[in-house]
Amino acid sequence: MFVPCAENVNDLDFSGFTLILPAVSIGNVGQLATDLTISSLSSSRHLIGYLHDASILPVVGNDAFARLGHEKGELNLSAEVYQSTEKRLVIVQQRAPISKGHYANYCQKLLAWIKRCSFKQVVLLSSISATDRVDAQLQGSPLRYMTTSVSQQLSSSFDKLSWVQLEKRPKFPDMTKESDELQFYLPGGGVTKRFFDRCEKEDVPLAVLMTFCSEGDNIADAVSLFLYLNDWLEITNKDTVGVN
C-alpha cells in the first residue's frame, strides 16, 4: 500500500512517531485540517511517499501548497505521505474518496501498514453531521473526541484541555427504555466508525478528533479542528497557522 519516493525502500520504522490522517467525511473538514497541518509544517516536512491501492479513487491536481511567486509545478495525488522528523509526525493527506464497497478492504490494508511502521499513536481527523445531534450536543463546543481502549490514558490529557468525549447513544433499533447498550453514532463520518472499530479490535492506539458540521463553506470548521489538534500536539504557534 505504501509507495516510497526513495528507491529500495518498502516500509519505514516510525517508532515514537504520531500518524495523522483524515477521514473523507462531511464537509471535507478532516482533509482541510490536514492541509493546514501540512502547510504549517512547511519548514520541517517533506514528502516521503504515497498510499496506493485499488480502494482509493485516482485523483491528480495542482500543488495545494504552492505559494505565490514560488510555484514549482508539482502535482498532488490521491494519498500522499509527509514526514516531519522535528515534530515526530507522519501525515497522510487523502484527497480522494474510497471506492464503494471497499471500506473494509481499505481499513484492513491501512491498519496493516500502520502496525508494520510501529507508530506511537494514530490521530484521525473527521467530521459528523450537525443535523443529527441530540439535545446535549446543541450547546457548547461542536468539537468532540473518542479514543480506543488501549489509549485511554489520553483521556486524562484531554480532560486537562476541557475536551468533550463524543456522547454514546442507545443502539439502534433497540432504542427503548429497557435498552442499555450504547454505541458511537457518526453520521456523515465516512470510514471513521469502521476504522475506529477495527483499531479497537486490534488494540491500536487511536484518537479521533472531530467536529459537528454541515456541507458548505467549511474553512472555519477546518481551522477550529486544526487548532483543536494543535492544542494537544503543539504543532505550530497559533499565530502562524497555515501561513507557510
Swiss-Prot record:
Places the protein is found: Nucleus
Cited Pfam families: PAC2
Protein name: Proteasome assembly chaperone 2
Any single Gene Ontology cellular-component annotation: cytosol
Organism encoding this protein: Nematostella vectensis (Starlet sea anemone)
Function as written in the Swiss-Prot or TrEMBL entry: Chaperone protein which promotes assembly of the 20S proteasome as part of a heterodimer with psmg1.
Disulphide linkage map: none
Keyword terms of this UniProt record: Chaperone, Nucleus
